[in-house]
Amino acid sequence: MSDNHTSIVSEKTNINNTKELGEKVLQFLIERKIIEEKLTDCTLGVLGYKPGSNFLSVLEKQNGDFLNLRINGLEVITKRTVFHSNGENLKGIYCPNCKQNQIEKNWSNALDSWYNKSNSDLIKCSNCSYENSITKFIFEPNWAFGDFGLVFWNWGKFKNQFFTDLEKVIGTEIKVIYGKV
């Protein structure tokens, strides 16, 4: 059986504030009983937070079947990460200017540069010569680049209001990435 995940990412978070932001978001989720306060072995590879008694309040479909799964928690990421869908093959990397697919272009160097925080994370479109950071190109399926993210394992579909509430707590727009491992 595979595990599904929903990654909620702030692409505009300052790298220097990610730990404090993580604590602020955790406090918000714990106070509303969306997650439990105690860290447990409920995510893939790292400790996470199990669903709290009020987790159904943020889900579109009122279903707690995932509670029986070993992997069913929240993972908080506070380091530079590319959030992607895992199981789906990358179909396209589109220029934000002309929408031309750049997947055949050598973009892995730009990705490595972004990870290493160098200034050479640029891709130049082979169609219109538009040049920008790899983070500005449009990925299919959707990818997000950030220093702060929440990964909910096997929770299902969230209510839009939950995303709106998180944007207020985080202080930036968020990007949502759905995936499967």
Segments predicted by a language model, with ranges:
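Residues immediately within or flanking Cys/His clusters that coordinate Zn2+
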Residues: 90-92, 122-125
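Short cysteine-rich clusters marking metal-coordination/redox-active sites
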Residues: 95-98, 125-128
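His-enriched metal-coordination microenvironments in redox/metal-binding proteins
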Residues: 1-8, 114-117, 142-146
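N-terminal alpha-helical interaction blocks
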Residues: 1-88
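Short, non-ligating residues that shape and space the ligands of small metal-coordination modules
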Residues: 102-105, 134-135
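Domain-exit/linker segments immediately C-terminal to small folded modules
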Residues: 126-181
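Acyl-donor (CoA/ACP) binding surface of acyl/acetyltransferases
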Residues: 92, 100, 115
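Short linker/helix segments within small regulatory modules
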Residues: 108-124, 140-141
